[in-house]
């Protein structure tokens, strides 16, 4: 089993990637928006009684940082592609921009689609035009993501589940890779 996992968050600016990380790592919600250029942090998590060091890499969604963003992709074990349910363009950009960038840099790394700011569906000014769960699930299927999750860093709903799923997805991918290696090492050849 993996003793450390690298999890990279991508998506447009201001979709809530940093808020999601802050809520998960410090159980607080940042009051002011602060654009991210490149940031990483780590926490220890437990899965099935085993401690895993989870490295969390927050990337800039702004196109001005497109050239340095791939540096954070190196050796990623799982990618969280995030969009805000209140920002339809951020949703469309997962398919039109982000999945292409991820697949060209990390062709075999599992991806999860994460809908953020779900509290906006109940109380936001754009609640009537918010992206619904069915649209999000369909997008996840279209981009061949390993899963679809929803969360709100503001209300702390679904945050823990996002990272539990990320860890489980990375561990399962590593197990599959190891099984394939075992089979290729133990191949029997008859001449």
Swiss-Prot record:
The induction comment states: By CSF2/GM-CSF. Down-regulated by phorbol myristate acetate (PMA).
SUPFAM superfamilies reported in the protein's UniProt record = P-loop containing nucleoside triphosphate hydrolases
Q: Entry's InterPro entries?
A: P-loop_NTPase, Small_GTP-bd, Small_GTPase, Small_GTPase_Rho
Q: Which residues are reported to carry the modification Cysteine methyl ester?
A: 188
| Keyword field | Cell membrane, Chromosomal rearrangement, Cytoplasm, Disease variant, GTP-binding, Lipoprotein, Membrane, Methylation, Nucleotide-binding, Phosphoprotein, Prenylation
**Any S-S bridges, and between which cysteines?**
none
Q: What is this protein called?
A: Rho-related GTP-binding protein RhoH
Binding-site residues, GTP = 11-18, 58-62, 116-119
Stretches for region Interaction with ZAP70 = 73-86
Check the record and name the Pfam families matching this protein.
Answer: Ras (PF00071)
Please report which protein family the annotation says this sequence is part of.
Answer: Belongs to the small GTPase superfamily. Rho family.
Tissue-by-tissue expression: Expressed only in hematopoietic cells. Present at very high levels in the thymus, less abundant in the spleen, and least abundant in the bone marrow. Expressed at a higher level in the TH1 subtype of T-helper cells than in the TH2 subpopulation. Expressed in neutrophils under inflammatory conditions, such as cystic fibrosis, ulcerative colitis and appendicitis.
Membrane topology qualifier: Lipid-anchor
Lipid-attached positions, S-geranylgeranyl cysteine:
188
| GO MF entries | GTP binding; GTPase activity; GTPase inhibitor activity; kinase inhibitor activity; protein kinase binding; small GTPase binding
Maturation-removed propeptide residues: 189-191
How it assembles, according to the record, is: Interacts with ZAP70 (via SH2 domains) and the interaction is enhanced by its phosphorylation by LCK. Interacts with SYK and the interaction is enhanced by its phosphorylation by FYN. Interacts with GDI1 and GDI2. Interacts with PAK5.
PTM (free text)? Phosphorylated on tyrosine by LCK. Phosphorylated by FYN. Phosphorylation enhances the interactions with ZAP70 and SYK and is critical for its function in thymocyte development.
User: Where is the protein situated, by its record's location annotation?
Assistant: Cytoplasm; Cell membrane
**Major location category of this protein:** cytoplasm
The UniProt comment on domains reads: The region involved in interaction with ZAP70 is a non-canonical immunoreceptor tyrosine-based activation motif (ITAM).
According to its UniProt entry, the function of this protein is described as: Negative regulator of hematopoietic progenitor cell proliferation, survival and migration. Critical regulator of thymocyte development and T-cell antigen receptor (TCR) signaling by mediating recruitment and activation of ZAP70. Required for phosphorylation of CD3Z, membrane translocation of ZAP70 and subsequent activation of the ZAP70-mediated pathways. Essential for efficient beta-selection and positive selection by promoting the ZAP70-dependent phosphorylation of the LAT signalosome during pre-TCR and TCR signaling.
**Keyword Cytoplasm found:** yes
């Amino acid at each position: 089993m993996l003793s450390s996992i690298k999890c990279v968050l991508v998506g447009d600016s201001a979709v809530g990637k940093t808020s999601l990380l802050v809520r998960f790592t410090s159980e607080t919600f940042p009051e002011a928006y602060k654009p991210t250029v490149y940031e990483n942090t780590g926490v220890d998590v437990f899965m099935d009684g085993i401690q895993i060091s989870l490295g969390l890499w927050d990337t800039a969604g702004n196109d001005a940082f497109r050239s340095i963003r791939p540096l954070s992709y190196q050796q990623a074990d799982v990618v969280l592609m995030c969009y805000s349910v209140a920002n339809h363009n951020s949703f469309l950009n997962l398919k039109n921009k982000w999945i292409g960038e991820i697949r060209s840099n990390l062709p075999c790394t599992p991806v999860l689609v994460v809908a953020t700011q779900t509290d906006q569906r109940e109380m936001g000014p754009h609640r009537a035009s918010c992206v619904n769960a069915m649209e999000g699930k369909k997008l996840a299927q279209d981009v061949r993501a390993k899963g679809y999750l929803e969360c709100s860093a503001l209300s702390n709903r679904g945050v823990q589940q996002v990272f539990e799923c990320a860890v489980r997805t990375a561990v399962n991918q590593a197990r599959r890779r190891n099984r394939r290696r075992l089979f290729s090492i133990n191949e029997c050849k008859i001449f």
